[in-house]
Each structure stands twice: as C-alpha cells, then as structure tokens.
Amino acid sequence: MVYDPRIPERQDCVQAYQIERWAVEKADDVAIIFHGGETWTWKQTLEMTRRAAKGFVQKGVKKGDHVLSWQANNKEAILTWFGLNYLGAVYVPINTAYKGNLLQHVVQVSDASLMVCHADLAPRLNDIDTGILSDVIVTHGEAEFKNLTAHPASDLVPETGLEGMLDVVEPWDTQYIIFTSGTTGPSKAVLSSYLQGYAMGPEAWPYINADDRA
C-alpha cells in the first residue's frame, strides 16, 4: 500500500502506540477513573493492556482476528478493547440489549470464535445458533453453555503481560466493528479504522481537552 502523507503517523493515531507513549511521558498521570473511584495511571494502563493482550494470545488471538465483547461499561470491557487492539486484533462490542434473532445475527456476522461476556448476559447464548463462536471468557460470575466452552475471568488478565507489541498496527487497519441499530433491517457491521476514530474525535468533541473527564 502506498503511504499517503496526509495520513498521520501510526504513533499519533493508533491506540497501542499512544498508550505506550503516555506510559513514558505521563507515567503517573491518571488515565482512567472507574466507577467506585479506582484509578489507573498511564503506566498501569499499559501494564494491564499488555496483560490482557497476553491473555488473548494464550487463547490463540492474533492480528486481524475478530473478538466479541458483550459487556457493560466496566473494567473488563476496557481490558478487552485495549488488549485486543494492542495485538492488532479487532474489537467487536455488542449491544447488551440484544437477544434472540438480533443477537444471533450479530454473533454470526462477526466472524468471531471468541467472546468476552458478562455472566448475566451469557444464558441468552444458549437460545441461538452461535455460528463459529466456540469459546467464551465469562466475567463477573460463571455460566454454563450447551455448545460453547466457558473460561474464567482470570484468563483475561494473566499474572504477567507481553513485553511489547507483536505486530505493526497501521492507521488503516480495522480497530473495531460497530453494528448499526438495525431499525431498517438486520444490523450492518461497520468496519472502523484507527484513522477514522482519530479523525472523528476532534470533529465530534472539539471542546474536550486533556483536563476533561468523559
């Protein structure tokens, strides 16, 4: 692929490189504040990202693979997102309201064999044809499946992490797949690149700066 000079350098717009940068330049600054008051610095965020990435490697995930995330807005969802993108894998979040045919359609179209799922949502998977989905990391509890293999939440964050990125991740690589609402038919899978997210941010939220919390 011919590199277009209008595209920012990967270090400026690809999430994994940004986390690594801030872990050096702003190591002790707060990066994330969770519900309940727990905080992660940028250094801690990189450490946890690398641990989650290693957990996915141990499940066979590699660059370009699609992995489903069916969770509320919580720590495990952040770990799933950041860990996958650190590998260059594709984060595929699912609306927590989905069930039945809507859920089945999204799971099958996602082309994912692995999911990270909140225990409260897991029983709905027994009511659908899950396609090539075979393994589920269950967070916040346990779950039993008819045709899927359940894995404990501890598999998401092993004791040690990767020492660095395993592959080069480019601005035009797919960062995540977002499904449309499905109001005019089955939900469509929208492939969003790192560059798309980088370009959209300042346009959508021009009033946010480094001192804001979102």
Locations of regions flagged by a protein language model:
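ANL superfamily adenylate-forming
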Residues: 122-171
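Conserved AMP-binding/adenylate-forming core of the ANL superfamily
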Residues: 30-74, 78-82, 99-104
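Conserved ATP-dependent adenylate/AMP-binding module captured primarily in the ANL superfamily
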Residues: 96-127, 198-214
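Short hydrophobic/charged patches on amphipathic alpha-helices used for structural packing
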Residues: 20, 53, 103-104, 166, ...
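A short N-terminal helical cap/helix-turn-helix that marks the beginning
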Residues: 9-31, 47
